[in-house]
Design a protein with these regions (language model features):
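DNA transaction DNA-binding modules
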Residues: 1-74
Length: 74
């Protein structure tokens, strides 16, 4: 999917002991929107969250929802 391609263009899953960032799907999507010329609506956030879960990106629940452990590629 477009979301999967964009995620792997700008991010990758963090390895177990690696420093990375814990970001929500909305934060990841916002970062991708800033860096790509492809318009993405905020309605895609829930779709994007499902994509991250499907790819088993490391995650944890926090007070603001689920965040994912990622590393920026670019």
């Amino acid at each position: 999917s477009l979301e999967e391609q964009l995620f792997y263009r700008y991010f990758r899953p963090a390895k177990e002991k690696e420093d990375g960032e814990w970001l929500s799907p909305a934060e990841i999507l916002e970062d991708i929107k800033k860096n790509s010329a492809i318009p993405l609506s905020n309605k895609r956030v829930s779709v994007f969250g499902r994509v991250l879960r499907k790819h088993e990106i490391p995650s944890k629940r926090v007070h603001r929802g689920t965040v994912y452990h990622v590393v920026r590629v670019l």
